[in-house]
Design a protein with these regions (language model features):
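Hydrophobic anchor at the beta1->P-loop junction of P-loop NTPases
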Residues: 31-33
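Short beta-strand-centered segment that lines the nucleotide-binding/catalytic pocket of NTP-utilizing
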Residues: 54-69
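Short phosphate-coordinating micro-motif centered on Lys-Gly-acidic
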Residues: 2-4, 88-90, 94-154
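Phosphate-binding P-loop
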Residues: 23-27
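Conserved lysine of the Walker
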Residues: 41
Length: 154
């Protein structure tokens, strides 16, 4: 697995990193986004969604569990599993609605450990460093030859 660590000093930089990550994603990809409350998870997803052509407001799905947004060429799913023990336990149909081969999914609070998330493309961990500063670690799982890959050296 390739890993990259980035330091950001404001929300614009965090959104820019999300946009950079989005450029390497394809329909069917799942990105796990973890970090404490207020770490910038939704900010990162907002940047990715904008880069994928989403024009609607991108907000935290904490109270609704998930949002779907229409991008230029792909639907973007944004799930928050904070209140769920697992996708199948609460609402099994969420898998079909939010995780599918025709969409890109971002899943906040993946610590809830749903087995359906084991094939996720990326794990992104955000950590507060004081003020607006964040340390963001991006871990890419192995890809097959010919798949788009991120430049994670640095």
């Amino acid at each position: 697995m390739a890993t990259r660590t980035v330091e950001t000093s404001d929300s614009r930089q965090t959104e820019a990193l999300g946009a950079e990550l989005a450029a390497a994603l394809s329909p069917g990809d799942v990105v796990l986004v973890q970090g404490e409350l207020g770490a910038g998870k939704t900010t990162l997803v907002r940047g990715a969604a904008r880069a994928l052509g989403v024009t609607d407001p991108v907000t935290s799905p904490t109270f609704s569990i998930g949002h779907r947004y229409r991008g230029r060429d792909v639907t973007v799913s944004h799930l928050d599993l904070y209140r769920l023990a697992g996708l199948h336990e609460e609402e099994p149909e969420l898998l079909e609605d939010y995780l599918g081969p025709d969409r890109i999914a971002f899943v906040e609070w993946p610590e809830q450990r749903s087995p359906e998330l084991r094939d996720a493309r990326l794990l992104v961990t955000l950590t507060h460093q004081g003020g607006e500063h964040r340390r963001i670690e991006v871990c890419e799982r192995e890809r097959l030859p010919g798949d788009a890959s991120l430049e994670l050296s640095g």
